[in-house]
Amino acid sequence: MAGSKSPKGEFAGRKLLLKRRASRWHHYKYVNKALSLKLKADPLEGAPMGRGIVVEKVGLEAKQPNSAIRKCVRVQLIKNGRQVTAFAPGNHAINFIDEHDEVVIEGIGGPSGQAKGDIPGVRYKVVMVGKNSIRELVRGRQEKVKR
């Protein structure tokens, strides 16, 4: 008859505690939290939004079973120089964004900070172009400021 690996008894508390503490490191979520890996990998460095310069416009194909070209932009962040892809939400929103424009991006709202819906690998969306909200530009309530 095989015995239990766990110590039993009146004075086994410390041993159980140490064993549990060591076992936690086998769980990926604990490791990520303990070493704050999410913050280190995050291009926005924990901030809710970030400013950046548009490097280029890109069209990404939607994942199956959808068939579309999702309009996105490559943005170089000002704070650390990292490049990320951001989705341009709204009808013809890409027409209001030009290369070398300053944009503000935020998370797209996918599950646990990941991509949302059928847009592969895109974790961010454009919120503002220059001083104007992208939503207001699309609706026609604001006009883009000409330099």
From Swiss-Prot:
The keyword Nucleus does not apply. Gene3D superfamilies: Nucleic acid-binding proteins. GO terms for molecular function: rRNA binding; structural constituent of ribosome. Keywords: Ribonucleoprotein, Ribosomal protein, RNA-binding, rRNA-binding. Pfam families: Ribosom_S12_S23. Belongs to the universal ribosomal protein uS12 family. Part of the 30S ribosomal subunit. This is Small ribosomal subunit protein uS12. The gene is rps12.
